[in-house]
Amino acid sequence: TRRLRHDLSDCVVAPRYRTDEGPPRCLPWEDIRRILRAVPRDRPVGLRDYAMLLVMATYGLGSGEVVHLELGDVDWRARILRVRRRKTGVPLELPLLPAIAQALAAYLRRGRPSQTLGHTIFVSLALPHRPLTTSAIRHRIREHAHRAGISAAKLGAHVFRHSHATRQIDAGAPFKIVGDILGHLRPASTSVYVRVALRRLRMAALPVPR
């Protein structure tokens, strides 16, 4: 056999072996409520953040979906909130619940800058009023969690989505419906929340008397 003059081992791409994903970071629902209560709603930034986080917590939307919500996605007459799924592209119509409608209306009337040129709902309050980014949402979540006395160091922008999904499964919601609402294409994507729910059940289980 012939030998190479140069070592080409660095050019060989090692195969990647897929491992099971770890459980998503979730918070108890009472902690989610504490974060929402901690948002000060006497200023425009608080009106925006409260409406944004309430939408995420109530519907389990991801930050990538929330930052793309537009004014036309809110059908006030039909009481529908339309969401464009980022992963699947499938449109989703959600009921515009009274609490959501009230929070959005308060923000749009007294919080969102009137001179904003675009149609994006959640925008920066500083000029030039660009749409919020997912990293900005993560920052806002951590700030309000810290205000609520909740450790925020590892909280990501999807913690509300993960907590919503786990809460639905804890409440006995059908597995398929939870996956559809979250926009999952594969059942395995939803199964991670089942593992979280089972882990919580084990932690809450009473010891068997001997």
Label each region the model flagged.
Residues 1-210:
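Conserved catalytic core of the tyrosine transesterase superfamily
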